[in-house]
């Protein structure tokens, strides 16, 4: 981001898009905690990441934390994986309207694992996607040899 005010404006527009979406991108509780919990946690996660690098958010849903990481950290190349068409379309539309540089993959992680994305990410994250014993095999194929998985509950 070029400056803090631009980031704040983009975050506000992103939050408004989440709140106004007809697609139930977040649960009622998630919407209630969006600005008090989910956005701050995503920003904190973004700040903790080394850079430059590549980040993959598996099961992006409404874009937490991946979309917020892309907003906060333009030095990172962020990819979002979302299997549900309406959610992937939302992420594409919001990225275009806000000018945020992300790549949205409308697919299941298991399907993409055999693609040219395998072994190319420094960080793979997933928030409330599945238990760790199921999640790790979905995420591991995307990691570089020194990459890490960040599973967020």
Language model segments and positions:
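Conserved active-site region of classical short-chain dehydrogenase/reductase
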Residues: 43, 67, 133
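Conserved glycine-centered beta->alpha loop in an early N-terminal alpha/beta scaffold
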Residues: 59
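Conserved SAM-binding loop of SAM-dependent methyltransferases across substrates and taxa
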Residues: 62-75
């Amino acid at each position: 981001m070029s400056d803090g005010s631009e980031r704040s404006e983009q975050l506000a527009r992103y939050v408004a898009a989440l709140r106004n979406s007809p697609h139930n991108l977040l649960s009622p509780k998630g919407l209630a905690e969006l600005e008090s919990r989910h956005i701050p946690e995503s920003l904190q996660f973004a700040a903790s990441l080394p850079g430059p690098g590549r980040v993959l958010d598996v099961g992006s849903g409404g874009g937490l934390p991946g979309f917020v990481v892309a907003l906060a950290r333009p030095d990172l190349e962020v990819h979002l994986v979302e299997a549900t068409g309406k959610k992937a379309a939302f992420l594409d539309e919001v990225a275009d309207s806000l000018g945020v540089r992300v790549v949205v993959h409308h697919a299941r992680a298991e399907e993409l694992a055999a693609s040219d994305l395998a072994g190319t990410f420094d960080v793979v994250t997933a928030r409330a996607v599945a238990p760790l014993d199921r999640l790790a095999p979905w995420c591991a194929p995307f990691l570089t040899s020194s990459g890490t998985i960040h599973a967020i509950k």
